[in-house]
Amino acid sequence: MGMEGLLQNSTNFVLTGLITHPAFPGLLFAVVFSIFVVAITANLVMILLIHMDSRLHTPMYFLLSQLSIMDTIYICITVPKMLQDLLSKDKTISFLGCAVQIFYLTLIGGEFFLLGLMAYDRYVAVCNPLRYPLLMNRRVCLFMVVGSWVGGSLDGFMLTPVTMSFPFCRSREINHFFCEIPAVLKLSCTDTSLYETLMYACCVLMLLIPLSVISVSYTHILLTVHRMNSAEGRRKAFATCSSHIMVVSVFYGAAFYTNVLPHSYHTPEKDKVVSAFYTILTPMLNPLIYSLRNKDVAAALRKVLGRCGSSQSIRVATVIRKG
């Protein structure tokens, strides 16, 4: 039996990878692994800083910690398998493993909602500062975050079983480096056009609702900032919002290409590059954008490093005295 026959009768899929036949797989492995380490470290540090420093116990940083958790999930669900495939000739992924990837990656819908809520948080902080403690109290924040996670999870619970229920009789080779729904559906030997249309409508809706919140929020913020007499107030307002605008631009740019543009604009190579952008690069960029442009986060990091340095000095001094 040839390779094609084996693939058709296997319960596994085969991932072709980010680059089908990389000229320098070792170099690609080193680059992706470095990005992975930086992304994981940056997001975990962000989560720990927000948890440990009482000055960061505010709605904005609580939402930011949830963003870091989601980004950690995205990169952990795709990159380890990608790195394994770069080192191994066996590029198979089990049916269950593929379904797990699809489910967790549909949580990206939750990140859309979370970015919309972060824009609303900035709107309240800039336009209604006196009512901020009331409008963004702990109960409201928890409700908003739970809603984001539930929204993304419901998307996964609906799309994953339907996608994996189609018969895959053409091939088991997925032209991608992870199980993305459009790439998996190309293997089906039945008509998936109705499902793809419904999925397209669902994705557009999940994009437009948060994007509308973001657009309205920042329109009000710009109008409020324009009416400010204080140059310091304007600078602070722009500094507060600029990091979020950068993250939204990067994330929604990739999402717009993937979910909104018609099929004629898509090629497997372009799709893989864009997917790498939002599953690998964005989780690395998000915490860096927020931390490098945020004095509170930088101060919290210095405080933690100072504690570590003091503890180490005390240990060394104790050892010297005992010696």
Curated annotation (Swiss-Prot):
Record bears the keyword Transport: no
Entry similarity comment: Belongs to the G-protein coupled receptor 1 family.
Extracellular side: 1-26, 81-101, 159-195, 260-272
GO biological process: one example: detection of chemical stimulus involved in sensory perception of smell
Cytoplasmic side of membrane: 51-58, 121-139, 220-236, 293-323
GO MF term set: G protein-coupled receptor activity; olfactory receptor activity
PANTHER family in alphabetical order: OLFACTORY RECEPTOR
Role noted for this protein: Odorant receptor.
Encoding gene (name): OR2T35
InterPro entries: GPCR_Rhodpsn, GPCR_Rhodpsn_7TM, Olfact_rcpt
Name recorded for this polypeptide: Olfactory receptor 2T35
Disulfide bonds: 98-189
Transmembrane regions listed in the UniProt entry: 27-50, 59-80, 102-120, 140-158, 196-219, 237-259, 273-292
GO annotations of cellular component type: plasma membrane
Keywords: Cell membrane, Disulfide bond, G-protein coupled receptor, Glycoprotein, Membrane, Olfaction, Receptor, Sensory transduction, Transducer, Transmembrane, Transmembrane helix
Cellular localization per UniProt: Cell membrane
